[in-house]
Amino acid sequence: MRECISVHIGQAGIQIGNACWELYCLEHGIQPNGQMPSDKTVGGGDDAFNTFFSETGAGKHVPRAIFVDLEPTVIDEVRTGTYRQLFHPEQLISGKEDAANNFARGHYTIGKEIVDLCLDRIRKLADNCTGLQGFLVFNAVGGGTGSGLGSLLLERLSVDYGKKSKLGFTVYPSPQISTSVVEPYNSVLSTHSLLEHTDVSVLLDNEAIYDICKRSLDIERPTYTNLNRLVSQVISSLTASLRFDGALNVDVTEFQTNLVPYPRIHFMLSSYAPVISAEKAYHEQLSVAEITNSAFEPSSMMAKCDPRHGKYMACCLMYRGDVVPKDVNAAVGTIKTKRTIQFVDWCPTGFKCGINYQAPTVVPGGDLAKVQRAVCMISNSTSVAEVFSRIDTKFDLMYSKRAFVHWYVGEGMEEGEFSEAREDLAALEKDYEEVGAESAEGDDEDEGEDY
């Protein structure tokens, strides 16, 4: 079995987690108490969904997940929410005082006390797996817990489970919307360890997802629930091939192989189509070609950066529902002929496609329409560097005055860590620049010979 363990860290990680597990349960027909009437093989069984759920002898399905936060309020919502019976109480770990938006508290002082407990619980989940494939880690890098404890856990997972893949779903600060003043510090410090300790990171950013909700779903004032439900569709599409039997299945390690040309260049953009409200879907025929095109629209990207400003290195298209390979090939062929979508010249094919016959499921009473087919795209584009350069600029403005730095130093960090992390990110921006311009230099030489 190829199990995946999900680790949800901090408020963002947990709330995205809630949306994901709600959706998984609906997709597999698992009730909020963990019972699954449709499952005939009680206690174990080699069903595809066992990658994400473990089964008890009593036929209860328990998510292979842990939720961690340094303060109790968000986890208490899980403990009292609709799905309270789904999780084992030991899977929900909360501390007493929060990280106060401070990376150093999450990473050094307070995080340090809780991290062993987390690893212990993860070890229990891992022992329960026959062939652990890897970890899905959900966090945000703007806050204190997601960035600090998130980095700490990733570092420790690398030590304990060196060869296992780690996929990160990471909420990055948005250009305009900010939830805390020290976001740039936390993000830079945290990206420093994401660079080293995740194999693939999918960047999400609230502002981009707000815009998608407003534009495509006509939600005047989107809430985090609206945002998270959209994100959960993306994550569900990515993991569908692990949870259902499909025609063209895609493994977690396959993402890595197909999307990451160089170890450091592993920050991905994601998009999902069709994002459409029930009123509209009734009147539209959404063909494979149409949803494929809209997945490539800059406005569909779930992070604020424009793929037209960069080049694609690789792309993963995960289709689900009523889709046949012939249509996919045609749609991809059309995309390749478009001049607006540029690939780097050293990666001619650039597409990895997966198809899953399970139609997309929607949360009842949610915003998305029930559709026959959907596509989720994860792409590696040099334009992601825009996200980093934005954060770096803000970091530099504050750090030049050493503003707020004493809060971090007071928790046992050294100033050197700031500059080290910042240099690492500067190097990353440079890496992206070079990858995009890889063989452009070759062209200049040819022109020289023409004279």
From Swiss-Prot:
**Binding of Mg(2+): at which residues?**
71
**Where is the chain membrane-spanning?**
none
**Positions with a binding annotation for GTP:** 11, 71, 144-145, 179, 206, 228
Asked if the Swiss-Prot or TrEMBL record annotates the protein with the keyword Cytoplasm, the reply is yes
Report the GO molecular function annotations. Answer: GTP binding; hydrolase activity; metal ion binding; structural constituent of cytoskeleton
Q: Which GO terms describe its cellular component?
A: cytoplasm; microtubule
Location of the protein in the cell: Cytoplasm, Cytoskeleton
Region Disordered: list its residue ranges. Answer: 432-451
The reaction(s) annotated as catalysed by this protein in its Swiss-Prot or TrEMBL entry are: GTP + H2O = GDP + phosphate + H(+)
Q: Major location, coarse class?
A: cytoplasm
Q: Which residues carry this modification: N6-acetyllysine?
A: 40
Segment forming the signal sequence: none
This entry's Enzyme Commission designation comes to 3.6.5.-
* InterPro entries with a match to the protein in the record: Alpha_tubulin (IPR002452), Tub_FtsZ_C (IPR008280), Tubulin (IPR000217), Tubulin/FtsZ-like_C (IPR037103), Tubulin/FtsZ_2-layer-sand-dom (IPR018316), Tubulin/FtsZ_GTPase_sf (IPR036525), Tubulin_C (IPR023123), Tubulin_CS (IPR017975)
Q: Post-translational modification, briefly?
A: Undergoes a tyrosination/detyrosination cycle, the cyclic removal and re-addition of a C-terminal tyrosine residue by the enzymes tubulin tyrosine carboxypeptidase (TTCP) and tubulin tyrosine ligase (TTL), respectively.
Q: Where is this site: Involved in polymerization?
A: 451
Q: Which GO terms describe its biological process?
A: microtubule-based process
Residue numbers annotated as active site: 254
Biological function: Tubulin is the major constituent of microtubules, a cylinder consisting of laterally associated linear protofilaments composed of alpha- and beta-tubulin heterodimers. Microtubules grow by the addition of GTP-tubulin dimers to the microtubule end, where a stabilizing cap forms. Below the cap, tubulin dimers are in GDP-bound state, owing to GTPase activity of alpha-tubulin.
Q: What is the similarity comment for this entry? A: Belongs to the tubulin family.
Quaternary form? Dimer of alpha and beta chains. A typical microtubule is a hollow water-filled tube with an outer diameter of 25 nm and an inner diameter of 15 nM. Alpha-beta heterodimers associate head-to-tail to form protofilaments running lengthwise along the microtubule wall with the beta-tubulin subunit facing the microtubule plus end conferring a structural polarity. Microtubules usually have 13 protofilaments but different protofilament numbers can be found in some organisms and specialized cells.
Q: Which PANTHER family match?
A: TUBULIN
The entry's protein name is: Tubulin alpha chain
Protein species of origin: Daucus carota
Lineage, opening ranks: Eukaryota, Viridiplantae, Streptophyta, Embryophyta, Tracheophyta
